C-alpha cells in the first residue's frame, strides 16, 4: 500500500535538529548542491563523468534533439509508377479496376497509398487519383497517355 504521509523521525526526538547541526542546514536544497539537475556542468561534473556516457555526458548534460508532435507529422505510404503498372495488371486480371474512355481509373487512397513517385516505367494509359504526386511521376503517366488528378484530403 502506498504511504500518503511523510515519515516522521524517532531518532533524537529530544534534540532540535536531529544531528544536522545549525537550524536550517537540513532544509530545502541548499545542502545538496541545488534542486534537481542543477550544477551538472559545475560542481556536480563528477556525477556526469561517473554515470553518463563517456565524452558526451548524456543523459545528464547537453541538447537531446527534437521529437515531432504526432498530429503534425504525416505518415507517407508511397508507391512508384512501375509498381503501379504491375498492380494495375493484377487488378485488371481480377476485374477490380474500372475503365473510363479507354483508360484505367485508380484511386490510390482506396489501395492504401497516399503518394505517387516516379520510379520505374508505365505503358498503360491510367487516370490516377492521389493526394500528392512527384513531377517525374506525372510526366511518365502523361507520356503513357494517362493523367494524374490531385485530390485534397486531410492526411492523418
Curated annotation (Swiss-Prot):
One GO BP annotation of this record: translation
Keywords: Ribonucleoprotein, Ribosomal protein, RNA-binding, rRNA-binding
Basic residues bias: start-end ranges: 1-16
InterPro entries registered for this protein in UniProt: Rbsml_uL15_N, Ribosomal_uL15, Ribosomal_uL15/eL18, Ribosomal_uL15/eL18_sf, Ribosomal_uL15_CS
Region (Disordered), start-end ranges: 1-37
Name under which the protein is recorded: Large ribosomal subunit protein uL15
RNA-binding found in the keyword field: yes
The protein's assembly and partners: Part of the 50S ribosomal subunit.
Keyword rRNA-binding included in the entry's annotation: yes
Family under the similarity heading: Belongs to the universal ribosomal protein uL15 family.
GO cellular component, one term: cytosolic large ribosomal subunit
Chain's role: Binds to the 23S rRNA.
MF terms (GO), sorted A to Z: rRNA binding; structural constituent of ribosome
Signal peptide, first to last residue: none
Gene this protein is translated from: rpl15
Pfam families: Ribosomal_L27A
Originating organism: Pyrobaculum aerophilum (strain ATCC 51768 / DSM 7523 / JCM 9630 / CIP 104966 / NBRC 100827 / IM2)
